[in-house]
Curated annotation (Swiss-Prot):
A GO cellular component entry from the record: cytosolic small ribosomal subunit
Official protein name in the record: Small ribosomal subunit protein eS1
Keywords (A to Z) from UniProt: Cytoplasm, Developmental protein, Differentiation, Oogenesis, Ribonucleoprotein, Ribosomal protein
The family this protein is said to belong to: Belongs to the eukaryotic ribosomal protein eS1 family.
UniProt subunit comment: Component of the small ribosomal subunit. Mature ribosomes consist of a small (40S) and a large (60S) subunit. The 40S subunit contains about 33 different proteins and 1 molecule of RNA (18S). The 60S subunit contains about 49 different proteins and 3 molecules of RNA (28S, 5.8S and 5S).
Keyword S-adenosyl-L-methionine: no
Location of the region described as Disordered in the Swiss-Prot/TrEMBL record: 1-21, 238-268
Amino acid sequence: MAVGKNKGLSKGGKKGGKKKVVDPFSRKDWYDVKAPNMFQTRQIGKTLVNRTQGQRIASDYLKGRVFEVSLADLQKDIDPERSFRKFRLIAEDVQDRNVLCNFHGMDLTTDKYRSMVKKWQTLIEAIVEAKTIDGYLLRVFCIGFTAKDQQSQRKTCYAQQSQVRKIRARMTDIINNEVSGADLKQLVNKLALDSIAKDIEKSCQRIYPLHDVYIRKVKVLKKPRFDVSKLLELHGDGGGKSSDAVVSTEGAVIDRPEGYEPPVQEAV
């Protein structure tokens, strides 16, 4: 064996043997996620994003994020009729450390939807596209099932095709009238109270008795041009404040100097 110095050991071993471990969360910031004032719970959670560095602005990575929240959590209500409805909220603007969200859709939970489908009854579904007063184009899915007559001895409660067509037409008319005659805020309140489905069930009783009538899903297909002042009205006190306002953690509106921009951190 040759006797001599080990050059590798004298120089500290191989290159890149040990690197300093950096916690990735040290480069991130927490932001509060705010729901519109049509819901009782304003702060629905927090979200994480990389801190602003150079041309990578944190707010650009926050806009467009979609949050799915149960209606029971939004309304602080343990009623089981609210727990199976999920509302989708999309981040549209960032003010200070607050992510301001707007309505982006609604859906039922999978277990609720599957539990309604049973044998010996007719499923009736209607899909309607309608536009609100303030320019939101929505696709609304409505579902209902025929109900068994208590005085009947039959096991089944199937509806005739002519009755199904009449019920579907009645569903379409009611949804069109409700959506086209309201703005987005009024429509969200109707969806939270489930008033549209109750009107459909009541109106179709003369054609064929129904049960488990629900607005199953709502999709936002098109939105009007983004306006900061309208978004701040949804998150403020409704006083029509201009875009020089910021929503605080309690939902109040705070004025800031005109032309104010948050400072950009150059180093982490």
